[in-house]
Design a protein with these regions (language model features):
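Short, low-complexity N-terminal regulatory "tails/caps" that precede and couple sensory modules
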Residues: 1-5
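Intrinsically disordered, low-complexity Ser/Thr- and Pro-rich stretches
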Residues: 6-7, 59
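Bateman (tandem CBS) regulatory domains
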Residues: 8-23, 71-83, 90, 139-146
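The conserved cystathionine-beta-synthase
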Residues: 23-43, 49-52, 68, 84-112, ...
Length: 146
C-alpha cells in the first residue's frame, strides 16, 4: 500500500524542519558572536531575525569574517535579505525547485514571517531519494566544489 506513494506530495516542510535553529539577532549580536556560533555548529550561514523573531535574511560566515576584519560591529550591511522561505504546510515537491537556486537552507516561517525553523537542503534530498544523510552531504559538497 505505502510503497507506491509519492512522498513529495505528503511530506511537508514542517515535518522535516529543524526547530529552534541557531539564529543571528540583528541588533543584539555582532560578527564575533556569529562567527563563534557558526564554528561551534559547523555551519556557514545563519538566519537573521529582528527583535520580533521575524526573518529578515541570512548572514554567511564569510560575510561575518569580513565585518570582523574591518572592525564593524553591526551585521546590518552583511545581511542578505533575499532568502527562500516557506510555511510549515509547504509540500516537499514545492521545495524542490528552490534547492536548485540556493546553497542555503529553506527557512520556515508563519504568516507573520516569524522564523519557525529551517530545512537543510540535504533533508529534502534525503526525503526524496531515501539515501542516507552522509551520502547526500557528500554529493552536495562534490557539486558545490565543481
Amino acid at each position: 500500500f505505502v510503497e507506491n506513494v509519492d512522498r513529495s506530495k505528503i511530506i511537508t516542510a514542517g515535518s522535516i524542519m529543524i526547530t529552534r535553529p541557531a539564529v543571528a539577532r540583528l541588533r543584539k549580536e555582532g560578527p564575533e558572536v556569529l562567527i563563534r556560533k557558526m564554528k561551534e555548529r559547523d555551519i556557514t550561514v545563519l538566519p537573521v531575525i529582528d527583535e520580533n523573531d521575524k526573518l529578515i535574511g541570512e548572514i554567511t560566515l564569510e560575510s561575518a569574517a569580513i565585518l570582523r576584519r574591518k572592525g564593524i560591529k553591526s551585521i546590518q550591511e552583511a545581511v542578505q535579505s533575499e532568502v527562500h522561505s516557506v510555511t510549515e504546510d509547504t509540500k516537499i515537491e514545492d521545495l524542490l525547485p528552490l534547492i536548485t537556486k540556493t546553497n542555503s537552507p529553506i527557512y520556515v516561517v508563519n504568516e507573520e514571517r516569524e522564523l519557525k525553523g529551517l530545512v537543510p537542503l540535504s533533508s529534502i534530498v534525503v526525503e526524496m531519494t531515501g539515501k542516507d544523510k552522509e551520502e547526500i552531504n557528500e554529493l552536495i559538497q562534490n557539486a558545490i566544489e565543481l
